[in-house]
């Protein structure tokens, strides 16, 4: 057979594969009339540790509370909260975690991992095909968005895909590689090409929604900002509850403390988008100050790849009136530790400038004010001198600590603002903003996108 014959044959086979898959699965994709009164079903997918994906857990909880059956998919790891584990409408599907047990070179392992992830995701989604909705976290973008697009085109065309944008995946890759690197450019193209055709795009800030229009050319009518809000278990503690926390963790986190101590809390995953040198240098300034300042107990929760580096830096500081403790907490204990603090700290430096730190939302839920490193979108959450203080660099952070702990009126003022924030709960926001997208309730006023400058003349997406 001539060479061009082989070429034509291969092209025909390549094009025939999705057509065959479509024909084979189309009959399973149609909803019989007898199923009209059945509960709606939503797949909630995150290619990450379920227990460390609070926003997706909150989505699953809200959907189940509204009567949806939920297939919750992600890695096994940290334990989700009990209302997820004990809910009969939520079924958890663990995605196998792929580890480099054979010590392969980074590039080789990365390629094999992505290939394996494609197969695992397609197999799982094929098993769950026919759902009414598929709610997906982004990032990670690769291979999630490509697989989801394939699923929606060929395996379950009736499913409405909702992407929940927590950040831009390509900007996270750009923390390790130059923005001009071919891999970063490919990741940006991949994210826009496969992510741009969802039924609806949720995003964590208004600024991110505007960037999605500008960067990826998305239709503004399909972008719905959903600010993170504290879930039900993040709430202010009474004075007696705070004393219970201090007593329960006296041997580990609150040892050798006096009544004069002020407690600062921060949480982290010890990754490059958080610069802990800012906090450590700020604490050093506080420690060296000549002012009459109270001693500090700084509690840092979490774990991650850069933790050993952080602990080594703490050892070298030799602070006198500042002491630091670290801990990895159970899900139920985390809100209690937050609620017992006088002040929260966020060191999150957004890779894109458009996302918001979930830890600040959690802290506000517990009614504690926050000092946060400033960046573009932060003002949508932290209002300086109202519910916290936004700072640039360690000098401003150190001076803020000194100002707040030497002037009770300033600390009390932002404490009041944080207590007001604690009343804005996830449940209230979700039902009003997102519920109608899943046929839960209806918009009683304007559509959510009409609150923002997202209008666009571009045509709507396919699905």
Swiss-Prot record:
CDD domains attached here? GT33_ALG1-like
Looking at the keywords, is Transferase present? yes
Q: Where are the transmembrane segments?
A: 4-24
> What SUPFAM superfamilies does the annotation carry?
UDP-Glycosyltransferase/glycogen phosphorylase
Identify the main location.
endoplasmic reticulum
> For this protein, what reaction is catalysed?
an N,N'-diacetylchitobiosyl-diphospho-di-trans,poly-cis-dolichol + GDP-alpha-D-mannose = a beta-D-Man-(1->4)-beta-D-GlcNAc-(1->4)-alpha-D-GlcNAc-diphospho-di-trans,poly-cis-dolichol + GDP + H(+)
Annotated InterPro entries: ALG1-like
What EC numbers are recorded for this enzyme?
2.4.1.142
Report one GO cellular component: endoplasmic reticulum
Q: Where in the cell is it found?
A: Endoplasmic reticulum membrane
Provide residue ranges for segments that penetrate the membrane without crossing to the other side.
106-126
The lineage's top-level taxon is Eukaryota
What Gene3D superfamilies does the annotation carry?
Answer: Glycogen Phosphorylase B
UniProt keyword list: Endoplasmic reticulum, Glycosyltransferase, Membrane, Transferase, Transmembrane, Transmembrane helix
- Protein name in UniProt: Chitobiosyldiphosphodolichol beta-mannosyltransferase
* Lineage, broadest ranks: Eukaryota, Fungi, Dikarya, Ascomycota, Saccharomycotina
